[in-house]
């Protein structure tokens, strides 16, 4: 069994796309998989309760499929920072509670388990703890999703430094092209783009698990399978 914590350089860096893509890739190889999203805001009200699209995407790529409450125990409606959403809801998570909750899913020892954070590495869980503390408590290697956009070199390097400062290994990183301006319609643009990737490869000092381009796939499931085509599982890089 291998478990990783997935974080990103920013809120919309592409954590769920990459995590679901890695799970889809593992399933292609016949491996058992599990994706967890312990804390999520921006959830929608359904007849079955609050549901988060990112958590549902991870659930769809988990095999065997777990109950929703297993992978997303703290679901909040407001699309704001999780600790603020939790305060509004009057249901504030703690690291002790999260560690206790993930104990049973992790005990299943699936071939690949990914725990996706919220936002970036330093996003607060509550007034006193960061969500990154879950990875620290569980001593998990980290996969960093780098949103490829202007400023990503600084964001990526600071994130990697913070992860290592917390005593955790950076198992790998994935570049996700989120800025449509980073196209290579001109030769000069492509050269700059390639230089950015080379700088990330040199300075992050961790394996690159793939570069995901902008995908045309419409549904989360289709996007997960499309992303899988550009990814490598940790340990294979």
Swiss-Prot record:
Q: What is its main location?
A: cytoplasm
One Pfam family, short name please? AAA_26
Positions binding ATP in this chain are: 12-17, 54, 116-119, 213-215
Q: Which GO terms describe its molecular function?
A: ATP binding; dethiobiotin synthase activity; magnesium ion binding
Catalysed reaction equations from the record: (7R,8S)-7,8-diammoniononanoate + CO2 + ATP = (4R,5S)-dethiobiotin + ADP + phosphate + 3 H(+)
- Enumerate the cofactors the protein uses: Mg(2+)
Which residues are responsible for catalysis? Answer: 37
Which InterPro entries does the UniProt entry name for this protein? Answer: DTB_synth_BioD, P-loop_NTPase
- HAMAP family for the chain: BioD
Q: Please describe the quaternary structure of this protein.
A: Homodimer.
Q: What is this protein called?
A: ATP-dependent dethiobiotin synthetase BioD
Write down the species. Answer: Chromohalobacter salexigens (strain ATCC BAA-138 / DSM 3043 / CIP 106854 / NCIMB 13768 / 1H11)
